[in-house]
Amino acid sequence: MNTLRSYIKSFLLWELLLGLKLTGRYLFTKKVTVQFPEERTPQSPRFRGLHALRRYPNGEERCIACKLCEAVCPALAITIDSEQREDGTRRTTRYDIDLFKCIYCGFCEESCPVDSIVETRILDYHFEERGEHILHKEQLLALGDKYEAQIAADRAADAPYR
């Protein structure tokens, strides 16, 4: 009896009809696809995108060259060189992030004791020339200056959970 039933189901293309029924059910529902460049979905304040270096309100860089972010980076994407200033404090002379190596894990942001390195909400960027994938200190500071209001708002929204 089971063999007869399986022959009837295969002759009537029962699996095909079940698939068409499923397709028909979703054919008239609301679409969930987002056309990305034209439409944007809301982002979380914790989104991890392009990196930026922050400054204090008086304009001084926050980075104290402790090199914790360089040590904690699992992909070895961060390179830091530093020197001592006349007042005895250390400051960075070189701060490079290789975006081809970076896995955007956020460990650098978590390990920074002065909240100097942050990951912004910038997710779409491209490179036209070889070597542009390495962000230098000046570029990172410029990104931090440009998006400081958004970075501060995101940090404030995330503060109760830190």
Curated annotation (Swiss-Prot):
[4Fe-4S] cluster 2 binds at residues 73, 102, 105, 108. GO terms for biological process: aerobic respiration. GO terms for cellular component: plasma membrane. [4Fe-4S] cluster 1 binds at residues 63, 66, 69, 112. It catalyses: a quinone + NADH + 5 H(+)(in) = a quinol + NAD(+) + 4 H(+)(out). It is found in: Cell inner membrane. Its cofactor is [4Fe-4S] cluster. PANTHER family: NADH DEHYDROGENASE [UBIQUINONE] IRON-SULFUR PROTEIN 8, MITOCHONDRIAL, NADH DEHYDROGENASE UBIQUINONE IRON-SULFUR PROTEIN 8, MITOCHONDRIAL. Belongs to the complex I 23 kDa subunit family. This is NADH-quinone oxidoreductase subunit I 2. It comes from Nitrosococcus oceani (strain ATCC 19707 / BCRC 17464 / JCM 30415 / NCIMB 11848 / C-107). The lineage of its organism: Bacteria, Pseudomonadati, Pseudomonadota, Gammaproteobacteria, Chromatiales. The gene is nuoI2.
